[in-house]
Amino acid sequence: MSASAASQAAQRQVRVQLTSKQEDIALPEDTGPILIPTGLRRYALSTLVNNLLGNEKPIPFEFLINGAFLRTSIDEYLTANGISAETTLEIEYVRALIPPLHIASFEHDDWVSSVDVLSATSPAASWASASVPQGQERILSGSYDGFLRVWNMSSQVVATSPAATEGGHTASIKAAKFVSPNSIVSAGLDRTVRLWKYSESDDGFSGTIAPQLELYGHKLDINSLAVHAPSNRILSASSDHMVGFWSTKKSDAPAAPENLLPSAASRSSKRRKLNSSVSTPQRGPLALMSGHTAPVSAAIFDANDSTVGYSTSWDHSLRTWDLVTSSLVDTRTTSHSLLALAHLPDHHLLAAGTSARHITLIDPRVSAATIAAMTLRGHTNAVVSLARDPHSNYGLISGSHDGTCRIWDIRATKTDKDGVVGESVYSITRKSLEEEGKSASKRVGGEGVKVFGVCWDAAVGIVSAGEDKRIQINRGEGVLSST
């Protein structure tokens, strides 16, 4: 904006109604509209609200107009959106966001594909009604070297899964999750889903990850897992176009398909057999659900109904499954390959990461008139991992092959020719780039720093994993307004 234009904007005024959904910072109900200069920006508006509230210690505020965060002057906003200054503008204010600052990084010997957290607020602990004292949280990582590792918050490895000859994975791990504080599930390129018993010494400095159950059924790589411990169920997404449905209990699971067992593979080929000195029970799937026509990238349980599942695929589709009958209920077809999936139940939306660098928010309900309810843009490479904000119903974190994680507030949107579009609130880069003195922009498409997995935990924060062979932890609390 030129100096003369800024001067004119400062002289123009607009009537605004300031509101907040947070009761402790709301203005009295009888506070009517007030006239303010259209040249004001966030800082000046924040000062104004603090003065109206009579705060001795100023609170930094952010401002939303029609659901979008104000990032310009009011005058520029009015001009960009074709709104007359004669209009009474309703402006909502919330506490200012806290940047997701880097807390720690844990280094591995190989790429890290997957991360999960065990904390007092994590699903695994909540399902088991288990308490995890502050500071005793654990981070689980799955790596391309074929090993699972459990870490404490001091970046020490508490336990490592056994080698292939001792009952471990025989190829790279792509997915790993805590089922409970003493149970872990993992899967990967060896086509198996494996359950492990996790235990720690009394002092918490050492532990064991012991093979408990091997599940066979998929014929190609397994790309992701979802767990619902209360029903003892697991979902898997595989490159064989199938969605696997499994039991965590040996007694509930059917026999493993003979033709997929390692013994059959060693008989039918001349390749070296990895003889395991550990005899682990082997079982098969409750169901393998067909329908996708390309590799399945993700499968999840409905957050409110564990008898419903969703899956995404390279075939561009999102599919809904009835897990009671293992049948396909609905198919939503998009324009791009879908690579990641997360449920936002309060908004009846599913977030799907795409190969086209954006996130599509889809309403899976049959009554939904349009497939894409919203599009989130900002990544410069494929979006391969998604997780909900545990602090806010509106928040989402994404991990991308562009080497960043982006935080989204689905209230921060605008409408353009392509419909409702959102931009990220924050972008988290890899700390490893900073240490090398390089910027993310110098890595074409995220080369060397691709993010493969992300988890957002209320106690620990934003935990991401990637091609830089690191787990990275960033602050996750207060990043978005919780209203």
UniProtKB/Swiss-Prot annotation:
Keyword Nucleus in record: yes
One Pfam family recorded for the sequence: WD40
Q: Which UniProt keywords apply?
A: Nucleus, Repeat, Ribosome biogenesis, rRNA processing, WD repeat
In its keyword annotation, does this UniProt entry include rRNA processing? yes
Q: Where is this region: Ubiquitin-like (UBL) domain?
A: 14-95
The UniProt entry's GO biological process terms, in alphabetical order, are: chromosome organization; maturation of 5.8S rRNA from tricistronic rRNA transcript (SSU-rRNA, 5.8S rRNA, LSU-rRNA); maturation of LSU-rRNA from tricistronic rRNA transcript (SSU-rRNA, 5.8S rRNA, LSU-rRNA); protein-RNA complex remodeling
- From which domain of life does this come? Eukaryota
InterPro entries per the record? G-protein_beta_WD-40_rep (IPR020472), NLE (IPR012972), WD40/YVTN_repeat-like_dom_sf (IPR015943), WD40_repeat_CS (IPR019775), WD40_repeat_dom_sf (IPR036322), WD40_rpt (IPR001680), WDR12/Ytm1 (IPR028599)
Write out the GO MF terms.
ribonucleoprotein complex binding
Record's subcellular location: Nucleus, Nucleolus; Nucleus, Nucleoplasm
Q: Name one GO cellular component term.
A: preribosome, large subunit precursor
UniProt similarity note = Belongs to the WD repeat WDR12/YTM1 family.
Outline what the protein does: Component of the NOP7 complex, which is required for maturation of the 25S and 5.8S ribosomal RNAs and formation of the 60S ribosome.
Q: What is this protein called?
A: Ribosome biogenesis protein ytm1
Q: Which organism is it from?
A: Aspergillus terreus (strain NIH 2624 / FGSC A1156)
Name the lineage: Eukaryota, Fungi, Dikarya, Ascomycota, Pezizomycotina
